[in-house]
């Protein structure tokens, strides 16, 4: 029995009727869906957002084919929670994944992969997982194999994926199974990481690529990590096409998360820059090449017009790296704009007009309701969903968001609507208010100038936090 089979009959019957209407209409062929997420890529780390140093011609080309989302947010200021929001359409605190390396994606959550698998999609996950451990038997990544973490074991096939090739958490961006060589040798960045002696450069990093229950892949793991991932993604897509099945895949690159490692060829493309920039930008360019490879493959299979690609990052750039948040305040682990406003675009040839730059506030929690809207599918039950469909934004230029975006991280909380942002960095003891339409860099706190706006937003935030708390306690689950 699948999770979806436990959903109340009336909801399932509603979805079944919608499914029949879609399947019977030949003009509504189900699109392929690729959700790409980079790791710690800052808003200002791509050419399409104005970076003059980084070389990202393929990502920029893809962005130009669709809508660039200037005001797109990660649901959290760090990795794991944002990923939970993509999977569920819910704020990560609802799912009890509040921080990196905490919690896991619970059985009671309904994921986008599960819903699409029920709709006949082939489903695959590639890259970082970070939503639980991938082994009970061996030490792996940050948490895998430790007795205290056995409760957090949950693999992608438990959440709707047919297949996967993924790591529990971070890996080096080049030679991902090997500890990086010393910073002095120019082969890795030393941003808080202990460098190792050259003679120890072949020591294992301590992570594996998992492909099944207690099963790892040990082949083709040398070189650029983004290329290693794409070597698995392309065959998955080809198999799906050959089987005449629409496909859904989450492509979660590790780049440019620490430890950032780049090969000589990519470093040399930035020879005029300092070593740290050579390595950081080099690994981004290596990832960009794989995005170009992905697009060429879609074109060669004549499915580029049948495929939706949504691209974003999981949070802002890491501190003390060459990563850029552009004009936005602070970086990763902050709920100010630089920590959660991330580069993003959406493309679907023939459906989303190219060359757009949209200021509509959107968030990673919007992915699930947007995809369901495109497919004309209802969510299977009535649990709270924080995201909303941005399909009318992408196709009809809708201007205003229906519901604000709430954020919770550590001792920070924030409430963002179409114009204003209410934020606290001390668990709600004090607040600041910013007009994001006129002050994108959050330089002027206007809470004393707009007390009525702040008061209403505080009340709404308080109600939302209570709803989130109820969900976190498991009140949304049917078991």
Please tell me what each predicted stretch does.
Residues 2-8, 13-14, 22-432, 436-479:
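Formylglycine-dependent sulfatase
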């Amino acid at each position: 029995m699948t999770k979806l089979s436990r959903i109340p009959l009336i909801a399932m019957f509603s979805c079944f009727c919608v499914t029949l209407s879609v399947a019977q209409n030949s003009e509504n062929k189900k699109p392929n869906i690729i959700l790409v997420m980079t790791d710690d890529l800052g808003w200002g780390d791509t050419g399409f957002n104005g970076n003059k140093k980084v070389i990202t011609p393929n990502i920029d080309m893809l962005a130009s084919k669709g809508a660039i989302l200037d005001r797109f947010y990660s649901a959290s200021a760090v990795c794991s929670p944002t990923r939970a929001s993509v999977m569920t359409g819910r704020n990560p605190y609802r799912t009890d994944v509040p921080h990196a390396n905490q919690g896991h994606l619970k059985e009671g959550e309904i994921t986008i992969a599960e819903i699409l698998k029920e709709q006949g999609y082939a489903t695959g996950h590639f890259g970082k997982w970070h939503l639980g451990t991938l082994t009970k038997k061996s030490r792996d990544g940050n948490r895998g194999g430790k007795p205290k973490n056995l409760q957090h074991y949950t693999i992608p096939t438990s959440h709707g994926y047919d297949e996967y090739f993924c790591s529990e958490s971070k890996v080096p961006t080049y030679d991902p199974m090997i500890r990086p060589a010393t910073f002095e040798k120019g082969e890795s960045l030393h941003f808080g990481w202990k460098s190792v002696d050259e003679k120890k450069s072949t020591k294992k990093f301590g992570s594996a690529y998992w492909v099944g229950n207690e099963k790892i892949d040990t082949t083709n793991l040398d070189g650029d990590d983004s290329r290693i991932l794409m070597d698995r993604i392309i065959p998955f897509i080809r198999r799906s096409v050959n089987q005449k099945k629409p496909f859904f895949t989450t492509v979660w690159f590790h780049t440019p998360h620490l430890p950032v490692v780049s090969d000589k060829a990519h470093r040399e493309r930035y020879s005029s820059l300092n070593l740290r920039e050579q390595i950081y930008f080099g690994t981004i360019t290596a990832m960009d090449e794989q995005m170009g490879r992905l697009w060429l493959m879609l074109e060669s299979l004549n499915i580029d017009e049948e495929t939706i690609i949504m691209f974003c990052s999981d949070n802002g750039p890491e501190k003390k790296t060459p990563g850029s948040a552009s004009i936005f305040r602070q970086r990763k682990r902050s709920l100010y704009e630089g920590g959660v406003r991330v580069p993003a675009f959406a493309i679907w040839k023939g459906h989303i007009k190219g060359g757009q730059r949209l200021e509509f506030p959107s968030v990673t929690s919007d992915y699930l309701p947007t995809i369901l809207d495109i497919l004309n599918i209802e969510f299977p039950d009535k649990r709270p969903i924080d995201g909303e469909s941005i399909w009318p934004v992408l196709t009809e230029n809708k201007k205003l968001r229906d519901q604000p975006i709430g954020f919770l991280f550590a001792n920070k909380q924030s409430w963002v609507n179409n114009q204003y942002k209410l934020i606290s960095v001390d668990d709600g003891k004090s607040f600041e208010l910013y007009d994001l339409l006129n002050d994108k860099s959050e330089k002027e706190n206007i809470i004393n100038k707009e007390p009525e706006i702040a008061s209403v937003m505080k009340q709404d935030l308080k109600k939302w936090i209570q709803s989130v708390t109820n969900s976190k306690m498991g009140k949304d689950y049917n078991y």
